[in-house]
Amino acid sequence: MGAGGRMPVPTSSKKSETDTTKRVPCEKPPFSVGDLKKAIPPHCFKRSIPRSFSYLISDIIIASCFYYVATNYFSLLPQPLSYLAWPLYWACQGCVLTGIWVIAHECGHHAFSDYQWLDDTVGLIFHSFLLVPYFSWKYSHRRHHSNTGSLERDEVFVPKQKSAIKWYGKYLNNPLGRIMMLTVQFVLGWPLYLAFNVSGRPYDGFACHFFPNAPIYNDRERLQIYLSDAGILAVCFGLYRYAAAQGMASMICLYGVPLLIVNAFLVLITYLQHTHPSLPHYDSSEWDWLRGALATVDRDYGILNKVFHNITDTHVAHHLFSTMPHYNAMEATKAIKPILGDYYQFDGTPWYVAMYREAKECIYVEPDREGDKKGVYWYNNKL
C-alpha cells in the first residue's frame, strides 16, 4: 500500500455524538502500524529545533507577562477587583504552564529535536521548574506507552476489577461522592502518583518516582533518577529563597496555585484520554501493543487544545508515534483517521461533562459478556 492508501474498515470512520459511547472494535485491526505510517506525510515525523523552541519561548513570554502584570499591577487594584484578578491569573497562568509541561513531556519522548542531549536538557529544566522529576517520569511514562491498555503492565490509571473495589466504594457512588473523589484526584492525584504510585500498577517494593532504587527503574536508569531529584531540590531551594525574600503568600499566589492548576489539568487530561465507556482493556491473553495504543480517545477542550499544544485532541496519534512533534500531530491524525475507521475514538463532549460521566460510568472493568473474548474487559458501574 502506498502513501495515502486506504484499507477497508468495518464501518464508516465518522460517528455522531450519540455514538461516542459505543464500544470500539476489540478484534485485531486489519491494518498495521506500518500501514498507518505510510499514510502520514513524511515531513510530519521531522523535528525542527527552531519550531520547537518557538512554542517554548512563546509560552515563556506569555507566562512572564502574566507574572509581570500580577506583581506590578494587582496591588494597585481596588480590593473587589483584586479578588477577581487573582483567580483569573491562576487560571490563565496554570493553562500556559500546562503548555510548558506538555513541551517538556515531548522532550521525554525525544520529539523536541534530533538531539537526545538537547531534549533531556530542556526537559530537565522545565519539568524540574514544575516539580516533575524529569528522568523518573520519562522512564515510567515510556513503560506506559509500551503497555497501554494492559491490565497487568500499564503504568497509570490501571482500572480495577469489581473484586478490588473497596467496601466504601458503593457509598461514594452518588453525585456528592463522585464530586468529592474527582476533587481529591485533581488536587492530590499527581503528587500521590509520583510519591506513592497511587493509581499505578502494583510493584514489589516501594514504587516512588523520587527513589532511585524503586522497582520502577533498572540499574542503567538509576543515576538519572538522582539527576531528577537534584533538579527538584534546586527548584525547591529557589522557591525557599523567593519565599524568604518576598513572603510565602507571594510564592503561593504567583507559583503555588498555578502549579495546582497544572497538576489538576494533567490528571484530568490523562484520565479522560484513557477512561471512556467505549474503550477496552486487555489481559495478557489478548493484549498486543497496537490494540493497546488504540485504546485511547481524543477529546475536545476548545481553545485549550492550542494552549495545550494539541495533546488533548491528537492523543491517539501520539500513542502510535510518540516521537512525532506536537505541531505535526493534527495533520497526522487527519491522515490516519480514514484507515483507523471505528478503531479511532473521538469524543467532543465538553471536558467538564465528560469527567463526571466517566466517574459515574467507568468504576471498574469486567470481562466481555457479549462475545467469546474473555481477555477483553469493559467498564461497568453496577456495584
Curated annotation (Swiss-Prot):
Top EC category: oxidoreductase
Motif window: Histidine box-3: 315-319
Chain ranges for the short sequence motif Histidine box-1 as given in the UniProt record: 105-109
UniProt KW keywords: Endoplasmic reticulum, Fatty acid biosynthesis, Fatty acid metabolism, Lipid biosynthesis, Lipid metabolism, Membrane, Microsome, Oxidoreductase, Transmembrane, Transmembrane helix
Documented effect of changing residue 324 to V: In C4M; Converted from a desaturase to a bifunctional desaturase/hydroxylase with a high hydroxylase activity
Membrane topology according to the record: Multi-pass membrane protein
Disrupted gene: phenotype observed: Enhancement of both microviscosity and lipid/protein ratio of mitochondrial membranes, which in turn were responsible for the change in lateral mobility of lipids and for bioenergetic parameter modifications. Increased membrane rigidity and cold sensitivity. Hypersensitivity to salt or osmotic stress.
Residue numbers covered by motif Histidine box-2: 141-145
Membrane spanning stretches: 56-76, 117-137, 179-199, 225-245, 252-272
Gene Ontology terms for molecular function: acyl-CoA (9+3)-desaturase activity; acyl-lipid omega-6 desaturase (cytochrome b5) activity; omega-6 fatty acid desaturase activity
Pathway of action: Lipid metabolism; polyunsaturated fatty acid biosynthesis
Catalytic activity: (9Z)-octadecenoyl-CoA + 2 Fe(II)-[cytochrome b5] + O2 + 2 H(+) = (9Z,12Z)-octadecadienoyl-CoA + 2 Fe(III)-[cytochrome b5] + 2 H2O; (9Z)-hexadecenoyl-CoA + 2 Fe(II)-[cytochrome b5] + O2 + 2 H(+) = (9Z,12Z)-hexadecadienoyl-CoA + 2 Fe(III)-[cytochrome b5] + 2 H2O; a (9Z)-octadecenoyl-containing glycerolipid + 2 Fe(II)-[cytochrome b5] + O2 + 2 H(+) = a (9Z,12Z)-octadecadienoyl-containing glycerolipid + 2 Fe(III)-[cytochrome b5] + 2 H2O; (9Z)-octadecenoyl-CoA + AH2 + O2 = (9Z,12Z)-octadecadienoyl-CoA + A + 2 H2O
Expression sites (tissue/organ): Expressed in shoots and roots. Expressed in leaves, stems, flowers and siliques.
EC number from the UniProt entry: 1.14.19.22, 1.14.19.6
Subcellular location, record wording: Endoplasmic reticulum membrane; Microsome membrane
Domain of life: Eukaryota
Keyword Endoplasmic reticulum set for record: yes
Biased composition (Basic and acidic residues): 14-24
Effect of residue 217 to F: In m7FAD2/L7M; Converted from a desaturase to a bifunctional desaturase/hydroxylase
Domain notes: The histidine box domains may contain the active site and/or be involved in metal ion binding. The C-terminal sequence (-YNNKL) is necessary and sufficient for maintaining localization in the endoplasmic reticulum.
Assembly: Homo- and heterodimer. Interacts with FAD3 but not with FAD6. FAD2-FAD3 heterodimers can form a metabolic channel in which 18:1-PC is converted to 18:3-PC without releasing a free 18:2-PC intermediate.
Family from the record: Belongs to the fatty acid desaturase type 1 family.
Record's function text: ER (microsomal) omega-6 fatty acid desaturase introduces the second double bond in the biosynthesis of 18:3 fatty acids, important constituents of plant membranes. Delta(12)-desaturase with regioselectivity determined by the double bond (delta(9) position) and carboxyl group of the substrate. Can use both 16:1 and 18:1 fatty acids as substrates. It is thought to use cytochrome b5 as an electron donor and to act on fatty acids esterified to phosphatidylcholine (PC) and, possibly, other phospholipids. Very low constitutive hydroxylation activity.
UniProt miscellaneous comment: Introduction of Ile at position 146 or 324 has a dominant role in specifying hydroxylation activity.
Protein's name according to its UniProt entry: Delta(12)-fatty-acid desaturase
